[in-house]
Amino acid sequence: MGDSEAMVSEGYTSAPYGDYNASAATVESTGQETAPIVDASHSVNNDSLVNGTAPVENGSATDNVAVTAPAAEHGDNTGSTLSTEEERLWNIVRANSLEFNAWTALIDETERIAQDNIAKIRKVYDAFLAEFPLCYGYWKKFADHEARVGAMDKVVEVYERAVLGVTYSVDIWLHYCTFAINTYGDPETIRRLFERALVYVGTDFLSSPLWDKYIEYEYMQQDWSRVALIYTRILENPIQNLDRYFSSFKELAETRPLSELRSAEESAAAAVAVAGDASESAASESGEKADEGRSQVDGSTEQSPKLESASSTEPEELKKYVGIREAMYIKSKEFESKIIGYEMAIRRPYFHVRPLNVAELENWHNYLDFIERDGDFNKVVKLYERCVVTCANYPEYWIRYVTNMEASGSADLAENALARATQVFVKKQPEIHLFAARLKEQNGDIAGARAAYQLVHSEISPGLLEAVIKHANMEYRLGNLDDAFSLYEQVIAVEKGKEHSTILPLLYAQYSRFSYLVSRDAEKARRIIVEALDHVQPSKPLMEALIHFEAIQPPPREIDYLEPLVEKVIKPDADAQNIASSTEREELSLIYIEFLGIFGDVKSIKKAEDQHVKLFYPHRSTSELKKRSADDFLASDRTKMAKTYNGTPPAQPVSNAYPNAQAQWSGGYAAQPQTWPPAQAAPAQPQQWNPAYGQQAAYGAYGGYPAGYTAPQAPTPVPQAAAYGAYPAQTYPTQSYAPPVAAAAPAAAPVQQPAAAVAPQAYYNTYY
């Protein structure tokens, strides 16, 4: 067997998951193998791959999660000159390695002008697939380029890297097996490759094309026992087209003798059973008269009882043989009926940079919920692996995967999934790194937690308030109060150096609050706010923090100090930059009025209410004012309070704007608990899955990207009026990263209910 054949048969590495893979194999059909461990000698020309510098399959050892061997740098070092367009596109992807459209344009341009320069083609594919290893169509194109120049060992190398990068793709395994059939003559080499593939994707609901190719190959070999065994294995799994497979199996059983359908092991077991039956029959006849066993006088012979028995039981054996498979089929169909709705709602079962729609995202959560309840760990792992191919750009699914594996006691799987998420698939999204930091802290890896926070501070999203708060809180939990204070001060110093910082007021406010909560040093907390007012214009978040701070202090309250600062924010000033929106100004005015309602006097309350009416009531829209019918003016306050809230509160006189005066700040000024995952929405209606997926062209799934496609931006939270009783309601400002959002559902999909408006996070929120 040649080197390339050895790689095809056995791959570069052992199968992923360690002990898990052995258990996974036991639930596969009879005869299915795990991917075997490879000896270094099988990859003479690929030592780096064998020795661990190459990628490994999804879910393998956590110390190696690279999924392709990228170029040393983005650029050309092949000795050839770049065209102007190539240079332009390389500059784009160097600046932003996630610019998918620029990458595909660069590949097209390189293929156009460098058809015979395989080194340049390798360079661009290596670099692209290092960023987007799940694009199976581009692995196929890469392999085709290597085949075109006759480098068969390189073709195998590309396919091996491909199945390491997108292990749970039916399509890439199908392309690899097809290549092996067309290239190698040794049936055992090809069969071992099929068996490697089926370990990972044999139970995939959409695995029919791969099973069909395997059946087709064995039909060409006319190895009917292997064909029958493949059908048997298929019928054990609830996959697509089960009815067709069962019908084909019955047709095979009707047209071939049972002796051809049974494997050697099955034939041996049947022979033992027949021999046992014959022995029992002989023992029962031993007491019969001797003359009953003689030949008749006329010389005629009797048919052997054993042969007669064998002849009469063959149809029964065939019926039993088929009946066992039919029972498998019925059981699989029963489970299929439970999952078919989820499977049909998966409109895009492969990776794509375009966002998924809301219905598909919800369907994945619902499907995972169902499989987790079913309790089959192997099914859970494989569905998660399918999910994080389709939903690779969504941190919530990686977080859920890691959390589930942790809860199941599978720390290695959790660690590996987290490494893939943070190092490859969502490496530029801060929430995955914040989750990683918390998980590492829980597991005692304090240095790793600090490194995760530092990565966010320095590279992923510098100045992200959530990261600062969580990092400082961790240092406080560890007893490093000075380090927590220092962290706030360092970030504040950086933000002060910026010409326009959107988070500086929030940083000051949070630092003041944190300082007071952990040290009860009221003077220091007040100094922080006062210092803030020396560096930034008074703003809603800063004023909220100051009002709240005064509210929790013992008398006397510094109302005279607060009043001009609040007025500076809520009064529009043509000569000064207005940093607060009209909604923010009105909300702050209401908060201040409620504060005065408790701690002020009648005179100060009246002044604030009159000012509120003057500033905000004349600007209400005519349509809003029309909502106040004559009955609203005549009805008593109690009647108004009893009216059903319909989500659009009518304008009210200022005197009636605070019905919940007793509902003050939350007790103990404490953060509210936070749980993950969030409550799931109602199950989405199943959508018709596109049946053409299984026969897609190798590259077609990646075509049709709109020109100028860019990653979608996070939606701006809907402003929410903040009653002071629920103080304070505040969102963090929009910062530099944009997590993936759901795409609009296509026209053919069922009409989705509009998502509820996202309430702004409370200023004093749930960060731990």
Curated annotation (Swiss-Prot):
Composition skew (Low complexity), residue ranges: 670-688
Pfam families: HAT_PRP39_C (PF23241), HAT_PRP39_N (PF23240)
Domain of life of the organism encoding this protein: Eukaryota
Keyword Repeat: yes
GO biological process assignments: mRNA processing; photoperiodism, flowering; RNA splicing
Keyword tags: mRNA processing, mRNA splicing, Nucleus, Repeat
Cited InterPro entries: HAT (IPR003107), TPR-like_helical_dom_sf (IPR011990)
HAT repeat spans: 116-148, 150-182, 185-220, 222-255, 341-373, 375-407, 444-477, 479-517
Biased composition (Basic and acidic residues): 286-295
Subcellular location: Nucleus
Annotated region described as Disordered, given as residue ranges: 278-314, 668-688
Entry comment describing in which tissues the protein is expressed: Expressed ubiquitously at low levels, with highest expression in seedling roots, developing siliques and germinating seeds, and, to a lower extent, in flowers, shoot meristems, inflorescence stems, developing seeds and leaves.
Gene null: resulting phenotype: Altered pre-messenger RNA (pre-mRNA) splicing. Delayed flowering under both long and short days, and slightly reduced responsiveness to gibberellin (GA) and vernalization treatment. Short stature and reduced seed set. Reduced levels of FLC but increased levels of FT and SOC1 transcripts.
Chief place where the protein resides: nucleus
Protein name (database record): Pre-mRNA-processing factor 39-1
Species in which this protein is naturally found: Arabidopsis thaliana (Mouse-ear cress)
Lineage: Eukaryota, Viridiplantae, Streptophyta, Embryophyta, Tracheophyta
